[in-house]
Design a protein with these regions (language model features):
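Feature captures the catalytic ectodomains and active-site-proximal regions of enzymes
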Residues: 1-208
């Protein structure tokens, strides 16, 4: 009923009378209230955080947590995104932030499409155009890296699952474990063991 009423209202709205392509309907989606989240810096002992993404829900979480939100021109959330721009923005943000969350959406979207070839391209692009670029610019710096997906999206299911995700953490003071590759199977024998979400952040920040 609300959607139909907005169509009626917008049809006679003065702004739309002068538009070639009028807005003729409003579709509210997932209404809710802002979550009462403890500020990131307060929860983690004064750590100043920034967030980079092309996804609005990720930005919303960052805003709710009191993190600085950084928007990168050309960031699309797909395989045509500005990989280099996001990598450079992350490096620049480290100049005045203790923690930077760089979110990449392309592989997730390819999984929902069920496109294996495109997903492999997305993963390879993230590896060569983001991770390698960030590491090259920060070579010699005292930086801790954490690599992980936010959730699994098996390409045969094309939807999110609750399967544990593989995590890799790298830094000067982190001991090397037996894992030689990054995968769900290999991670089961890794030195981190199984970490719940809140424990993961604590572990990463304990290393900083």
């Amino acid at each position: 009923d609300l959607i139909e009423r907005t169509q009626e209202f917008l049809a006679s709205h003065p702004i739309n009378r002068g538009r070639h392509a009028p807005a003729n309907m409003i579709w509210p989606q997932s209404p809710g209230r802002r979550p009462a989240m403890q500020p990131f810096s307060e929860k983690y002992g004064g750590v100043k955080g920034a967030i980079i993404s092309a996804v609005d829900v990720i930005f919303g979480l960052g805003v709710s947590a009191g993190m600085d939100v950084i928007k990168v021109p050309g960031a699309t959330g797909f395989v045509d995104t500005n990989y280099e721009g996001k990598a450079d923005a992350a490096v620049a943000a480290l100049a005045d932030h203790d923690f930077v969350y760089l979110h990449m959406e392309a592989a997730d979207e390819c999984s929902h499409m069920g496109d294996l070839k495109l997903k492999l391209q997305a993963i390879e692009d993230i590896d060569s155009r983001v991770i390698a670029r960030v590491r090259a610019q920060l070579e010699g710096a005292e930086v801790t890296y954490a690599l992980l997906p936010d959730h699994p999206v098996p390409i045969n299911l094309r939807k999110h699952t609750r399967t544990p995700i593989p995590v890799a953490i790298s830094g000067r003071h982190i001991p090397v474990d037996a894992c030689k590759i990054y995968s769900e199977t290999a991670a089961q024998d890794g030195g981190l063991g199984f970490l719940a979400g809140d424990l993961f952040m604590k572990r990463v920040l304990d290393i900083l």
